[in-house]
């Protein structure tokens, strides 16, 4: 069945795909019969640049940077000119999915890893809990599958769940072989933690900094691989696509070098999107904050930078600034005619640190919420309201070990009923040494603000955390766009269903990054790089002609618009929803976008202009609208999507929401790819 869903300024074509008992029908994604009706594209959005600004100096280096060799820049063999580069594989994103994939395909060709910030600055690096995998004799794949499907409110694709749970242990062993160091027990075996929704201890972890350790190991391997070239501070603008009969084909990506303000065109045989989620459509998120400061970089004499040989060692200081999780991959894929699925399922982590409850209030508002890992509750942490009344047993028999959607809604209900701003998570009844061993990062962060978690409860509040929806992928990470693969949070593989089970995200990224390798290699064997392809599309330009004063005005207005959008999403598209509130959000977002776009063009913005903040804003608008429209299409409450107008689970609606690409009706600049699709 198909339903045409009206949006604020157009329509999207939705289709529900029935799969029965958590299993979707087996099909090749590229064989979808796409709806090409004349309907407006939801991705209408716009934005403004973030360059030519004075940023404060921040020269501190992360442990990953200190322990890694300088990342390789591109050699002339990959260049056509300074602004066009050719690779066998282009990887957008430097988290666990992107790096793991890059290391495998690098055995078969050259790889460009394109990342918008520092290479380590990804959601992976912020992941605390761990990776779930069946490594204990008392556990089983069937147990892990059952826990995943129950947490996903029976919307999971059973075939995907089985594949991921079965292949997980091997992916862990590969990480260990690559040098990742995980916690071990006194018996010498891996220490396996337990988290909410899991029936067994199966979480492999490195204290409460698991993602950081995995990222370190992967980055070190990437540095040592001669076929992988890292392009840091390169922001992906739009995918380069062509139409070949009924097929859309991906040929690479345009990216903005935010250090030099040049647009670089990457032409590749295969492109992997591993760009993460869209947490910054909300004002409070656990996703990485904005990276702002001054970058100092020394280039060795023997390297080529932007196609020019540096005769002497050069010190460059450049302004930088970007958010990480702004939905870039999802929005780019949507504009490129990729299928999007299950965007209504936004996971709010139930326990982010509530600054208002700390003994010492932070001097400034955080750019992101500090995550208190699921493992705290898994280790026996108890949730209380401010009267120290335990409340979770009133909501679910699993109490604190219930899945995230249940715990987040329960906390939200307590806060609204009691008119309070946070609840308390107490682990102080556990031995001090155990707390400090398992949660050193959390203990240190809380102690910065006068809170000793070995004696005091932690103030916590829900925050946007993870997108269960994304670009629809098959079992090998393939999409309906030829040459385009996806892995990690940007993808919707069917694993998570309506709610992600704790510590299944890194697992999914590892499994699908690995599964996408062979079809990618096969695709490169059957395709050639056309060295005239770079001329198929017009090149975006940087708006230097507007001048620094005008750009400053545009940037300030864009930041205001970003906050307005985030406020609308939190107020009307949060943990508990209603049809009226969703419709209000749809209308207000559409109006906000149109007003902002009009402002841009009044200031002299041109259709071909791009900037970091501009592209982030257009992508945030795109993802916000996808979430709202998907939520309006689901007339039931399931998993992370809870609406008071349809409070019950409806068996007949246990179907994934799929947003098919529409025929482009490009009545505004922001509703289309910056480059017109090449016709072949």
Report residues per predicted region.
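Extreme N-terminal leader/targeting segments of oxidoreductases
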Residues: 2-89, 107-108
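Glycine-rich loop(s) and the adjacent beta-strand/alpha-helix scaffold that form part
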Residues: 270-297, 311-370, 401-402, 502-515
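N-terminal Rossmann-like FAD-binding beta1-loop-alpha1 element of flavoenzymes
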Residues: 88-113
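An anion/pyrophosphate-binding glycine-rich loop and adjacent beta-alpha core
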Residues: 332, 338-458, 510, 519-526
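Glycine- and aromatic-enriched mobile tails/lids
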Residues: 2-6, 78, 85-87, 118-120, ...
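Conserved redox-cofactor binding core of oxidoreductases
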Residues: 174-262, 267, 353-354, 362, ...
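Glycine-rich FAD pyrophosphate-binding loop
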Residues: 106-128
